[in-house]
Regions:
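Polar helix-capping/helix-linker motif
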Residues: 8, 46-48, 152-157
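Membrane-interface micro-motifs in multi-pass membrane enzymes
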Residues: 118-142
Length: 157
């Protein structure tokens, strides 16, 4: 398969881009939905667990959205070069990173609350997942394409 052709798994990237763009249109351009309902705010997660996933769909502004869409295109190119044979790898990676992001922020919040520090912040955007994908690509280039952290990932050698 040529690198400039569309593969069967490209729908994963198109769906991601479509959702990011759609949420931006509905929250920022049309204003139908208040994007503050999507922010990842650690103290609200127990009552509103949907924020674990919706926060990655929300972006601060058009530049933030465009930089994340550019990151999706770049990581798609390199993942395609690696020759991923696993189905739904990209979507599984996104979901895994969302849970990992939630866990890290939750632990951070618990550590700070132990010292009676309660920061007021919200996390938004797809940037963390893009950075995780770049880190994954960097590690697979160093350590090989067949196994990652002891698990078979089935990239061509």
């Amino acid at each position: 398969m040529a690198l400039n052709s569309i593969s069967k798994s490209d729908w994963q990237y198109l769906v991601t881009g479509f959702f990011l763009t759609s949420v931006f249109i509905f929250t920022d351009l049309i204003g139908v939905i208040n994007k503050e309902y999507f922010y990842f705010v650690p103290r609200l997660i127990s009552d509103q667990p949907h924020r674990i996933f919706t926060s990655i769909l929300t972006h601060a502004d058009l530049n933030h959205l465009l930089s994340n869409l550019g990151g999706i295109i770049i990581t798609r190119y390199f993942l395609m070069r690696l020759g991923n044979k696993k189905r739904f790898f990209y979507l599984k990676f996104i979901l895994s990173c969302s849970f990992l992001n939630f866990f890290i922020i939750w632990v951070y919040e618990k550590i700070l609350s132990y010292f009676n520090i309660y920061p007021n912040y919200a996390a938004i955007g797809f940037s963390g997942i893009i950075y995780a994908l770049f880190g994954f690509l960097l590690l697979t280039s160093f350590y090989g394409k067949k196994y990652f952290l002891g698990k078979e990932i089935s990239f061509k050698s």
